[in-house]
Design a protein with these regions (language model features):
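Interdomain boundary/hinge segments at the C-termini of tandem beta-sandwich modules
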Residues: 2-8, 86-92, 170-176, 254-260
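Short, solvent-exposed loop/linker segments at the N-terminal edge
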Residues: 19-27, 103-111, 187-195, 271-279
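Solvent-exposed loop segments of extracellular immunoglobulin-like
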Residues: 37-45, 121-129, 205-213, 289-297
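Solvent-exposed segments in extracellular or luminal domains encompassing
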Residues: 56-69, 140-153, 224-238, 308-312
Length: 312
């Protein structure tokens, strides 16, 4: 007698170790064909062969340029065949854009920039690495806080789940130190209503968009402008606080001196004169207070040698 064994039908399943790969050279996947039934030994033929390191083995490495469906044909020792398919998806190119909420920061501690990176393409599961790390709160964060001491270009390397990488950069400018210089058109004023001083504050450095606040506000036309008019009742030291758009501040001071009240006492060398030509009197005035640099005007001018001098 002869016994003829009928083997189970030949079947095959196909799979990919990673069904989604990236476009970078290091991102590949391993295909696998698992045959059952039929009669050993099996041979394998994968199509298309494009992107495969060897289309005639059970587990080729696949690196297609675009999404591709691979079909494997398995042939057993009897010449029976079975087929299966598997699709390897190719993710779009990994790209990244780096941004900051403030491209120019100040030198004061409260002025910082918040960085951010938006990644797209590749396979999600991104990791981040910012460089240089100096001035960063966390170089591995998607959104670190940056406080560089000088203008710095930060570059972030984004790595996706396939190990593909891309980079993006953003510049954080550091403004010069904020300073303010103050001056007055007159540092010594009198008590009369018309005597006042124009104050001036000139800010530099920092980031423009300055605000001003003078103190004390007493005697100022407007304490919240750069150049108020000052009319203090007594000698006063004014301090201006300048704040830039980053919230950094600088101060400077000046003193407006208020002279004592101006007073004058007039005298005559002879309060009683005669009518003869040789009889005359010399007038004089003693001035105190105010600010020296006095001018004089006597009236009436009748009978005076010069009404515009101190001692006519």
């Amino acid at each position: 007698d002869i016994t003829v064994n009928v083997v189970s039908p030949l079947t095959v399943t196909a799979s990919a170790a990673d069904p989604l790969i990236g476009t970078c050279p290091t991102s590949t996947t391993t295909l696998n064909a698992v045959a059952l039934g039929g009669e050993l030994n099996y041979t394998y033929n994968w199509l298309p062969a494009t992107g495969l390191d060897n289309p005639s083995i059970q587990t080729p490495t696949a690196k297609p340029a675009v999404t591709t469906t691979y079909t494997v044909t398995v042939t057993d020792n009897n010449g029976c065949t079975a087929t299966a398919t598997v699709t390897v998806n190719v993710a779009p190119d990994l790209t990244a854009v780096a941004t900051t909420d403030d491209g120019t920061i100040g030198t004061c501690p409260t002025s910082v920039a918040h960085l951010d990176v938006t990644a797209s393409g590749g396979e999600p599961g991104y990791t981040y690495l910012w460089a240089p790390v100096a001035g960063l709160s966390d170089p591995n964060s998607k959104t670190p806080t940056a406080k560089p001491s000088a203008t710095t270009t930060y570059t972030v390397t984004v790595t996706d789940a396939n190990g593909c990488q891309t980079t993006a950069s953003v510049v954080v400018n550091v403004a010069p130190v904020l300073t303010v210089a103050v001056s007055a058109d007159d540092y010594n004023i009198g008590t009369c209503p018309s005597s006042d001083a124009q104050l001036t504050a000139i800010a530099s450095g920092g980031e423009p968009g300055y605000t001003y606040l003078w103190s004390p506000a007493t005697g100022l036309s407007d304490p919240a402008i750069a150049n108020p008019v000052a009319k203090p009742a007594v000698t006063t030291t004014y301090t201006v606080l300048v704040t830039d758009i980053n919230g950094c501040t600088a101060t400077s001071s000046l003193t407006i001196t208020v002279a004592p009240v101006l007073s004058a006492t007039a005298t005559a060398s002879d309060p009683n004169i005669g009518t003869c030509p040789t009889s005359q009197s010399t007038l004089d005035v003693i001035v105190t207070g105010g600010e020296p640099g006095y001018t004089y005007l006597w009236s009436p001018s009748t009978g005076l040698s010069d009404p515009a001098i101190k001692s006519p």
